[in-house]
């Protein structure tokens, strides 16, 4: 799990750049905000063990995943 932690751990500046990229790529700022929140909520209930570890909050993970989907379209899943 240590490699997973290092892979997903990013600093706040990088996280803000990713948030801005998501907002800029979206036609509707409200909709992308709701999509990120829904993904974080879904992740929270799907993986309760990750919450107990406490190394990454679901909202940060959702932003990272969704911004990766912008840059790497082959990993886009069903939404």
UniProtKB/Swiss-Prot annotation:
It comes from the Bacteria. Keywords: DNA-directed RNA polymerase, Nucleotidyltransferase, Transcription, Transferase. The keyword Nucleotidyltransferase applies. GO terms for biological process: DNA-templated transcription. It is an enzyme of class 2 (transferase). InterPro entries: DNA-dir_RNA_pol_omega (IPR003716), Pol_omega/Rpo6/RPB6 (IPR006110), RPB6/omega-like_sf (IPR036161). GO terms for cellular component: DNA-directed RNA polymerase complex. The keyword Nucleotidyltransferase applies. Its EC number is 2.7.7.6. One of its GO terms (molecular function) is DNA-directed RNA polymerase activity. It catalyses: RNA(n) + a ribonucleoside 5'-triphosphate = RNA(n+1) + diphosphate. HAMAP family: RNApol_bact_RpoZ (MF_00366). Promotes RNA polymerase assembly. Latches the N- and C-terminal regions of the beta' subunit thereby facilitating its interaction with the beta and alpha subunits. Belongs to the RNA polymerase subunit omega family. In cyanobacteria the RNAP catalytic core is composed of 2 alpha, 1 beta, 1 beta', 1 gamma and 1 omega subunit. When a sigma factor is associated with the core the holoenzyme is formed, which can initiate transcription. This is DNA-directed RNA polymerase subunit omega. It comes from Synechococcus sp. (strain JA-2-3B'a(2-13)) (Cyanobacteria bacterium Yellowstone B-Prime). The lineage of its organism: Bacteria, Bacillati, Cyanobacteriota, Cyanophyceae, Synechococcales. The gene is rpoZ.
């Amino acid at each position: 799990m240590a490699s997973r932690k290092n892979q997903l751990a990013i600093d706040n500046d990088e996280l803000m750049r990713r948030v801005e990229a998501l907002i800029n790529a979206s036609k509707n700022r409200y909709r992308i905000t709701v999509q990120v929140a829904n993904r974080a909520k879904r992740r929270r209930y799907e993986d309760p063990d990750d919450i107990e570890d406490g190394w990454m909050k679901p909202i940060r993970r959702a932003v990272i995943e969704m911004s990766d989907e912008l840059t790497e379209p082959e990993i886009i899943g069903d939404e």
